[in-house]
Amino acid sequence: MTAKTIRHYLQFTDFSLEDYEYVLERTGILKRKFKNYETYHPLHDRTLAMIFEKSSTRTRLSFEAGIFQLGGHAVFMSTRDTQLGRGEPVEDSAQVISRMVDIIMIRTFEQEVIKRFADNSRVPVINGLTNEYHPCQVLADIFTYYEHRGPIAGKTVAWVGDANNMLYTWIEAAQILGFKLRLSTPPGYALDMKLVSPDSAPFYEVFEDPNEACKGADLVTTDVWTSMGFEAENEARMQAFADWCVDEEMMGHANPDALFMHCLPAHRGEEVTAGVIDGPQSVVWDEAENRLHVQKALMEFLLLGRLKH
């Protein structure tokens, strides 16, 4: 593989609408193969390096199982027990690791770190999560919506809660896929406009009242109030976010057939009530499973390009 052919997936804007249409189609195909116990090994003998600076359940399991199901295998690497955690330059680690594997997934804190790694990698790099963006999760959410309701283009998504990596990724997705995002965050926790492209302005609207943000929504989504790395702010956040709990009353402002999503782990009684996340509008378990399927399609696409079957 030459440098000219390498594609990375570091944030949602790395793919075009046409790329997403293809990847979502492939996701459905790969999920059907999985459900039918059909052996499919297009990535036979390929190796995925998984580098974790942030702990994970869903990210590790979905990538490790996914590459295995495609015929490859995974190597787990933690910064706690590699030279990355002992001060080796990111650029040097990227040069070495990318000469020994076929594709790399990184889950870390700063987006700048994964960008520097990708700039020095000889193989595709996937963002498994950073403080700024979480593209694999939003891609899974969009596929989940597609499964249950059809294309998301022209629909309305409501975000209630923190201005975190999920929200910034949803804003990018709205611009590329053509849906409307209505968002509400507490005072003092507004968007960091350095992470928002001016071109995305027509695709999102900010509301002070979370109930107002949910009006007419086809999908309501949220996340934890205190993300990893912000634990010191937890007490202050519990007070600031108290009115941003997605409950049955808030869901009542959305369309009657609106879905509810949460990327998990969830804290019932904080960002969402048990009645909502465990209720009939919730699709969080399908959403969690779909991380597996979209990431399989993503790895297949980055390594093999567009397939004709």
From Swiss-Prot:
First-tier enzyme category under EC: transferase
Pfam families in alphabetical order: OTCace, OTCace_N
MF annotations from Gene Ontology: amino acid binding; ornithine carbamoyltransferase activity
Subcellular location: Cytoplasm
Keyword Lipid metabolism attached: no
Reactions mediated catalytically: carbamoyl phosphate + L-ornithine = L-citrulline + phosphate + H(+)
This protein's record includes keyword Cell division: no
Residues reported to bind carbamoyl phosphate: S56, T57, R58, T59, Q83, R107, H134, P135, C136, Q137, C263, L264, R291
Assigned GO CC terms: cytoplasm
Domain of life (superkingdom): Bacteria
Keyword annotations: Amino-acid biosynthesis, Arginine biosynthesis, Cytoplasm, Transferase
InterPro entries linked to this entry: Asp/Orn_carbamoyltranf_P-bd (IPR006132), Asp/Orn_carbamoylTrfase (IPR006130), Asp/Orn_carbamoylTrfase_sf (IPR036901), Asp_carbamoyltransf_Asp/Orn-bd (IPR006131), Orn/put_carbamltrans (IPR002292), OTCase_ArgI (IPR024904)
The protein's annotated pathway: Amino-acid biosynthesis; L-arginine biosynthesis; L-arginine from L-ornithine and carbamoyl phosphate: step 1/3
An example Gene Ontology biological process: L-arginine biosynthetic process
Chief location of this protein within or outside the cell: cytoplasm
EC number from the UniProt entry: 2.1.3.3
Residues binding L-ornithine: N165, D223, S227, M228
Described function: Reversibly catalyzes the transfer of the carbamoyl group from carbamoyl phosphate (CP) to the N(epsilon) atom of ornithine (ORN) to produce L-citrulline.
Record family assignment: Belongs to the aspartate/ornithine carbamoyltransferase superfamily. OTCase family.
Protein name: Ornithine carbamoyltransferase
Organism listed in the record: Burkholderia lata (strain ATCC 17760 / DSM 23089 / LMG 22485 / NCIMB 9086 / R18194 / 383)
Source organism phylogeny: Bacteria, Pseudomonadati, Pseudomonadota, Betaproteobacteria, Burkholderiales
